[in-house]
């Protein structure tokens, strides 16, 4: 597996509340994670850092999980535990009241990839030169779009587009979505925060992923492109290809 992680403050925000990275368990099986924190007084970066650290630390203690079913079970259970830890910590610190974070994570299982998500950080797959979104946003705007109350055009500039219906650290229990999809040689997996998807149209995202650039260059182009369109939020990108091997590395 070859992975490239990038995170950038953007052009407007004073702090980067995104977090993520690539981490391996005892059998060198990787997990890739992106989290986008929220909350005032830098509480957002505490929440996203906790989510990534707690999930990756738990993963580092495991041995290889070989089936998609095993991985789904582990992700659901562990993310639930991570959520409880963030809630308890927020309750113990007055300055952190109201903090939370999105989370999207992926683990490879033989010829498949298992993805888990909470919030509006997304997972995409480029397969057969077509980019498709794997995850569903847990947001007010997505719900309005799903029920036909607003159009896609309305959604792009909706005044309440940042309101999440699910996030880690908000309530004692959280619903975690999981997806299992084929992941083949030459496919590219993209995990990202909304600082990318709110700035760069999916048609351009697809063109970048289909280009002849290296994976590292593609990651850099995503950050540059999002900033060129305004960089209104923190931008985080994690790209994964199956056909190369690279030792996992932490990043934040």
UniProtKB/Swiss-Prot annotation:
Name the positions where Mn(2+) 2 binds: 36, 194, 233
InterPro entries cross-referenced by the UniProt entry? PP2C (IPR015655), PPM-type-like_dom_sf (IPR036457), PPM-type_phosphatase-like_dom (IPR001932)
What reaction gets catalysed by this protein? Answer: O-phospho-L-seryl-[protein] + H2O = L-seryl-[protein] + phosphate; O-phospho-L-threonyl-[protein] + H2O = L-threonyl-[protein] + phosphate
Explain the regulation of its activity.
Activity not affected by inhibitors of phosphatases of the PPP family such as okadaic acid and cypermethrin, or by inhibitors of phosphatases of the PTP family such as sodium orthovanadate.
- Report the membrane topology from the UniProt record: Peripheral membrane protein
Q: What class of enzyme is it?
A: hydrolase
Keywords for this entry? Cytoplasm, Hydrolase, Manganese, Membrane, Metal-binding, Protein phosphatase
Q: Which CDD domains match?
A: PP2Cc (cd00143)
- What EC number(s) does its UniProt record assign? 3.1.3.16
GO annotation terms (biological process) = signal transduction
The protein's superkingdom reads Bacteria
Q: Where is the PPM-type phosphatase domain?
A: 2-242
Q: What happens when the gene is disrupted?
A: The stp-disrupted strain is 4 times less virulent than the wild strain, demonstrating that stp is required for full virulence of L.monocytogenes in BALB/c mice.
Q: Which cofactor does it need?
A: Mn(2+)
* One of the record's GO molecular function terms: metal ion binding
Tell me, in a sentence or two, what this protein's role is. Answer: Protein phosphatase that dephosphorylates EF-Tu.
Q: What's this protein's name?
A: Serine/threonine phosphatase stp
